């Protein structure tokens, strides 16, 4: 199984790239994790936000292909670390690759939400999307460590 983070936005601060890369390199070869960045649509005073969201959504879904789609969204289901580890095990048993979608400033398109098999809420708080990349990578690495009895996670 391959994990794929599909995120809107291409120019992240150095600290985001450093943090994300740190967890990316820790993933084992039998569970590769990749980042696919979708260019954010131009937002301005008179921007058609729905059209921008729809275009970003089309690109995200094209990148995900036939993968299991999991959206990152506030109204999604909150998983604690052991629950995420169980989800990761289910995904591995399913055999399909998994695409986790992070929207832009206005969130995800309706098409992305409709295509999702699951929706994961990291918090009821609104989090900066660059920070979400790092949190997701660390959370998935921690979940993997539980499933393999790796000493990274401590109870």
Curated annotation (Swiss-Prot):
<comment type="function">
    <text>Specifically methylates the pseudouridine at position 1915 (m3Psi1915) in 23S rRNA.</text>
</comment>
<keyword id="KW-0698">rRNA processing</keyword>
<comment type="similarity">
    <text>Belongs to the RNA methyltransferase RlmH family.</text>
</comment>
<feature type="binding site">
    <location>
        <begin position="122"/>
        <end position="127"/>
    </location>
    <ligand>
        <name>S-adenosyl-L-methionine</name>
    </ligand>
</feature>
<protein>
    <recommendedName>
        <fullName>Ribosomal RNA large subunit methyltransferase H</fullName>
        <ecNumber>2.1.1.177</ecNumber>
    </recommendedName>
</protein>
<comment type="subunit">
    <text>Homodimer.</text>
</comment>
<dbReference type="GO" id="GO:0070038">
    <property type="term" value="F:rRNA (pseudouridine-N3-)-methyltransferase activity"/>
</dbReference>
<dbReference type="InterPro" id="IPR029028">
    <property type="entry name" value="Alpha/beta_knot_MTases"/>
</dbReference>
<dbReference type="InterPro" id="IPR029026">
    <property type="entry name" value="tRNA_m1G_MTases_N"/>
</dbReference>
<keyword id="KW-0808">Transferase</keyword>
<keyword id="KW-0963">Cytoplasm</keyword>
<dbReference type="Pfam" id="PF02590">
    <property type="entry name" value="SPOUT_MTase"/>
</dbReference>
<feature type="binding site">
    <location>
        <position position="103"/>
    </location>
    <ligand>
        <name>S-adenosyl-L-methionine</name>
    </ligand>
</feature>
<feature type="binding site">
    <location>
        <position position="72"/>
    </location>
    <ligand>
        <name>S-adenosyl-L-methionine</name>
    </ligand>
</feature>
<keyword id="KW-0949">S-adenosyl-L-methionine</keyword>
<dbReference type="InterPro" id="IPR003742">
    <property type="entry name" value="RlmH-like"/>
</dbReference>
<dbReference type="GO" id="GO:0005737">
    <property type="term" value="C:cytoplasm"/>
</dbReference>
<keyword id="KW-0489">Methyltransferase</keyword>
């Amino acid at each position: 199984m391959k994990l794929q983070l599909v995120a809107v936005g291409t120019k992240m601060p150095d600290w985001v790239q450093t943090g994300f890369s740190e967890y990316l390199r820790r993933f084992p070869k039998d569970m590769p994790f990749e980042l696919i960045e979708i260019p954010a649509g131009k937002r301005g005073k008179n921007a058609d936000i729905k059209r921008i969201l729809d275009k970003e959504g089309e690109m995200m879904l094209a990148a995900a292909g036939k993968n299991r789609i999991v959206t990152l969204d506030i109204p999604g289901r909150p998983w604690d670390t052991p629950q995420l580890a169980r989800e990761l095990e289910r995904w591995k048993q399913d055999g399909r690759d998994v695409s986790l979608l992070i929207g832009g400033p206005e969130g995800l398109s309706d098409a992305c939400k409709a295509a999702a098999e699951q929706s994961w809420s990291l918090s009821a708080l609104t989090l900066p999307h660059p920070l979400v990349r790092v949190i997701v990578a660390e959370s998935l690495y921690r979940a993997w460590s539980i499933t393999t009895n790796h000493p990274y996670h401590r109870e």
